[in-house]
């Protein structure tokens, strides 16, 4: 069981269906202890085993037919979104390093999708690492009201007065931290070597 204080920001609970869009802001040691490595490699092995099933190839064919507008049957994609935090509660994660927790959550979601969800989402033998980046934003910032713990929220639109506010809008710049991206990528490759293909 993790010793992370539940009041701290836990990036493992902030994932979408595609995982996290960046590793920026995750306070990781970039080195996992032996129990974390064993846990992650074990989960990755299970994902690889599930990805090798013939049904995954069939699901990929269904999606190709669907995207080519030739599908004879509908394809189903289920994503519990914030429900993931109930399906896989943060308190059930065994890793303590924040990045290890993100990866553990991701692998557990893949396993749940394959074993319990039983939709047409393809389980693949890849482990994708996102770029470590920041963006400069649009120049105006929304104010959210509510939304604690992934709940619903309303927001105040940042563009309230066209004449006054529009000139503040700018195109965001994406700034990639190549060094940190490479370090996280190397960590994943060393961890999942021979189990899952690590991709950037």
Enumerate the predicted regions with their spans.
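Catalytic cores of TIM-barrel enzymes
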Residues: 2-200
């Amino acid at each position: 069981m993790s010793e992370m204080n539940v009041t701290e920001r836990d990036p493992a609970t902030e994932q979408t269906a595609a995982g996290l869009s960046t590793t920026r802001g995750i306070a990781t040691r970039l080195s996992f202890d032996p129990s974390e490595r064993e846990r992650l490699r074990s989960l990755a092995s299970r994902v690889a085993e599930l990805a090798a099933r013939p049904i995954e190839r069939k699901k990929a064919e269904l999606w190709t037919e669907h995207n080519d507008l030739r599908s004879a049957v509908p394809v189903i994609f289920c994503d519990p979104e914030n429900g993931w935090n109930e399906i896989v509660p943060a308190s059930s994660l065994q890793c303590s390093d924040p990045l290890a927790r993100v990866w553990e959550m991701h692998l557990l979601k893949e396993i749940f999708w394959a074993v319990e969800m039983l939709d047409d989402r393809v389980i693949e033998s890849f482990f994708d690492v996102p770029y470590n980046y920041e963006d400069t934003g649009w120049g105006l910032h929304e104010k959210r009201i509510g939304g604690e713990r992934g709940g619903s929220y309303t927001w105040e639109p940042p563009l309230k007065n066209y004449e006054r506010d529009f000139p503040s809008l700018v195109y965001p710049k994406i700034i990639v931290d190549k060094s940190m991206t490479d370090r996280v990528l190397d960590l994943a490759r060393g961890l999942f070597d021979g189990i899952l293909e690590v991709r950037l």
